[in-house]
Amino acid sequence: MNAPPTPLPLPAGGVALDLAPHRNNAGCHSRSLIAAEGLDGFGRAFAAHGLQAAAAALGFPEQWGEGEPDNVACEGQTLELAAPIKASALHVAGVAAGGSTAGVFRLCHGDAGTSAVTTVRVRLADFLARLPAEDSVLFAEADFLYDIGGRTQRRAQPRMWLATVSLPRPALCTRVELPVNPDLHVFGVWLRPDDT
């Protein structure tokens, strides 16, 4: 008898930001997609089987696993908030490709010329790493890996991480600017409102 799945470590009280307009990479496959770029440009990707709970929590598109983009390869995209949030922490679900990688997220408020900016450095471990980077925990784990050329690697278990960075002081935020580093793949972003 299989053990029940481990609950996802979703950020308590976190407000999820909408990534849908910015998704530009398919990092989860439900079958071999030889022509796919995957997470590293060579086709390596999560096997979608076993990630259904994560897909639902992260709001993946209906056709995820079939080549539909499910994450954002960071190229400086701007995530607009529906309403301003006074944030006390930033949460990022994602992975790095090519080793542990850090990027600077910019929490902005105001117009482009007069905006107040709070920079938040987030480090994510590689999707094939066994251990998380600092300030991170395991978010989800696939049953196996689709390797270069669409080959199935059942001995490899790619992992998705959840990084949490508390701000030194609460910051008013109306938009979040992602880093410029396509080796960082973001599957989910949350802001935790300040409750003081």
Model-derived segments and their meaning:
Residues M1-T196:
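N-terminal/edge-of-domain interface segments
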